[in-house]
């Protein structure tokens, strides 16, 4: 087995979680588009939406699932079933499964090691479990990539400039690190979501007549 140094592993991780890695993440918004369209999320309230996503919503659930998938001996098939069951509606299920499937296919093509389709956090955990990096570091960068994708969706929809969006991401970074640290020691019973507004937004997005994003 080829050994990879921590320095090379960080580059590999940054590549996997880059928006340039072809998973189609730019096409999804986790229901944020509907909330913005209805005026429930504005440039003033977006930071709170992101904090709730991270502490009580899909961000936290993804962090726990990723943490579990990174561990030696993890049952990735069981975790994939759990990740799918946690999705509140059809488009959120499609969002994580389609991105995870693309991620797995790309990693398999790059590494020559087969990767079966899975929900995104499980696919990432399975691919990155062999990297000689702390779990908190992997989870933190994953969460930042997901938060950046949501902010990018807001930049494309709201009157929100890209620099202001980057400032929001920078302001969220202490919370990202804290969530990653908590998730690093989490177990399945810590999986929970209480962002009903975001879940309802994702459901209502499915019936929008005109939309930019797929969720």
UniProtKB/Swiss-Prot annotation:
Recorded GO CC terms: cytoplasm
Any GO molecular function: nickel cation binding
Entry-linked Gene3D superfamilies: Urease accessory protein UreF
Superkingdom of the organism of origin: Bacteria
InterPro entries assigned: UreF, UreF_sf
Annotated keywords: Chaperone, Cytoplasm, Nickel insertion
Keyword Cytoplasm: yes
Protein family membership: Belongs to the UreF family.
Role this protein plays: Required for maturation of urease via the functional incorporation of the urease nickel metallocenter.
Protein name, UniProt field: Urease accessory protein UreF
